[in-house]
Amino acid sequence: MFIYDTKLKQKVPFEPLVQNKANIYVCGPTVYDDAHLGHARSAIAFDLLRRTLELSGYEVMLVRNFTDIDDKIINKAFKENKSIQELSSIYIESYTRDLNALNMKKPSLEPKASEYLDAMVHMIETLLEKNIAYRVSNGDIYLDTSKDKDYGSLSVHNSSIEFGRIGLVQEKRLEQDFVLWKSYKGDNDVGFDSPLGKGRPGWHIECSSMIFKTLALTNTPYQIDIHAGGADLLFPHHENEACQTRCAFGVELAKYWMHNGFVNINNEKMSKSLGNSFFIKDALKNYDGEILRNYLLGVHYRSVLNFNEEDLLVSKKRLDKIYRLKQRVLGTLGGINPNFKKEILECMQDDLNVSKALSVLESMLSSTNEKLDQNPKNKALKGEILANLKFIEELLGIGFKDPSAYFQLGVSESEKQEIENKIEERKRAKEQKDFLKADSIREELLNHKIALMDTPQGTIWEKFF
């Protein structure tokens, strides 16, 4: 298994801290709003990593957090006259619902920052005792980054390293010094009683503390195998996590760092500040979650994905092919083709080379369809094909529906009954040799994006986009 390590800026062999085990921490959302496609892409990228590792024989523990203490949450909760717990719980439920629709495997743990305040306080106390952290006059506590000779080694963020000293008004020793603890400021603020005084943790200390409490190993130079997240988190968040961990405990936080690329909307980086965020829940109004998943995983996780509906519909054709083949082989038993399994897994073991894996899949779909055309009653072949498709389901998380359900997505039960009534009406017209009426019914359904196919077993229908 090879993965791209952001810190080394190259692909490296994955060699876990404990043989045949992999522990992964993925930075989750700050829960003050609904999740957007950037959140979806990050979750899918590292869901693919987990699935690939598991199918390669690793026992995987994946932790993805919820940041439920943050300035954005506090500000929005105040505006909406809610507690931060009430507000964050709304968006935790929304995020979970959205990711379930995308067929995401549930993380091993989903810690909330608010559940690990003691660990955060302990880490800050350690930094104060070592004279690496310092207080300013308003009670806030900062980390002195000059005490970490390796600061900037992860992100190589030159501008941060070259910052000079600034005036005493802000009281920070260096511009890149970051807050560990924010003291309680009174009305419209949130604070927790602690040995540090009333206040709340900074963003960066939250993730490091949750890692130590949920995943960290003992007696190792690294605490976890893989720390992952979006490219936007590389600096300052991940840089500062790594820094405070070295300073507090003298170890590196992670052996490997992995980051997924941005999602652009119309060639412009998606962000709430630009007002072009595309929420998952809005995308799900137009497209089934599996169709979105299939589209989002189709571009290599480190590349920028420029979201547009034209490409989404093109990618849907791949799903259509999977389900059409599945439709032909349902109800058969057999073993997977070992060469197919080996070839496609090797693609994913090469830093999740999903494009190459999908090319192998496309080749299998075409060749097996041709073989079925030549020998449609070959049960052994059908069983092998179904086993191949089952492996794709496990590896990529697509192709798991019943084909008839897939081809009838977006049609309500009442609409289905109307279609069945039309099919029955068309059948009677054909029996009475009223072919003009039969054709008229077919045309009427086509106008509503319903295609009819006459088979030896009767007429079946599909909805098309």
Can you annotate each of these PLM segments?
Residues 1-32, 47, 118-332:
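Alpha-helical recognition segments enriched in aromatics with Gly/Pro capping
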Residues 8-13, 17-103, 454-461:
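N-terminal, positively charged nucleic-acid-binding surface of large information/translation enzymes
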Residues 58, 132, 450:
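Short phosphate-binding/catalytic loops that engage adenosine nucleotides
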Residues 66-70, 92-95, 105-120, 138-147:
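Short, glycine/charge-rich beta-strand/loop segments that flank catalytic centers
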Residues 78-84, 108-114, 230:
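The substrate-binding groove and active-site-proximal loops of carbohydrate-active enzymes
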Residues 95, 100-106, 124, 128-133:
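Active-site pocket-lining segments that scaffold enzyme catalytic pockets across diverse folds
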Residues 269-272, 276-465:
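Structural preference for alpha-helix termini/caps and helix-kink/transition segments
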